[in-house]
């Protein structure tokens, strides 16, 4: 049975909702097609941004545009292999359904609102790689903010 382990939004939830967050972990590194996507795009694990870099936005200032694009291509590859993207197009309903199924989020949950906002923010981007990285960064940043606000509460 095909699992949804590549679902990048679940990755964001696990990364930031977990009490033992590992901000040094590479985005997408725990998924089955990670090595395949790295190989397809000519990257090594050292080339991939960490969760901490992406959630804080440091990836935008610490890396060249070509590195940003290549990381985005790896994210797009993971999303596409899980059937959540085709080229530069999201399957928004499938993303929501998978996210809800995997996280147990309920209607009105701030995580779903964040996912929807991130998809809306990126929907008109045409480059599939850039679009994927911006989407992932948006979700990771939102998850970090939500995790911080719930820890403070």
Swiss-Prot record:
Cross-referenced InterPro entries: PBP/GOBP (IPR006170), PBP_GOBP_sf (IPR036728), Pheromone-bd_protein_Gp-9 (IPR022354)
GO cellular component, one term: extracellular space
Subunit structure: Homodimer.
Pfam families noted in UniProt: PBP_GOBP
Compartments where located: Secreted
Signal peptide residue numbers: 1-19
BP-aspect Gene Ontology terms: response to pheromone; social behavior
SUPFAM superfamilies: Insect pheromone/odorant-binding proteins
Role of this protein: Colony queen number, a major feature of social organization, is associated with worker genotype for Gp-9. Colonies are headed by either a single reproductive queen (monogyne form) or multiple queens (polygyne form). Differences in worker Gp-9 genotypes between social forms may cause differences in workers' abilities to recognize queens and regulate their numbers.
GO molecular function: pheromone binding
CDD domains xrefs: PBP_GOBP (cd23992)
Keyword field: Behavior, Disulfide bond, Pheromone response, Pheromone-binding, Secreted, Signal, Transport
Keyword Signal listed: yes
Protein name: Pheromone-binding protein Gp-9
Family membership noted in the UniProt record: Belongs to the PBP/GOBP family.
Disulfide bonds: 37-77, 73-129, 118-138
Main location: secreted
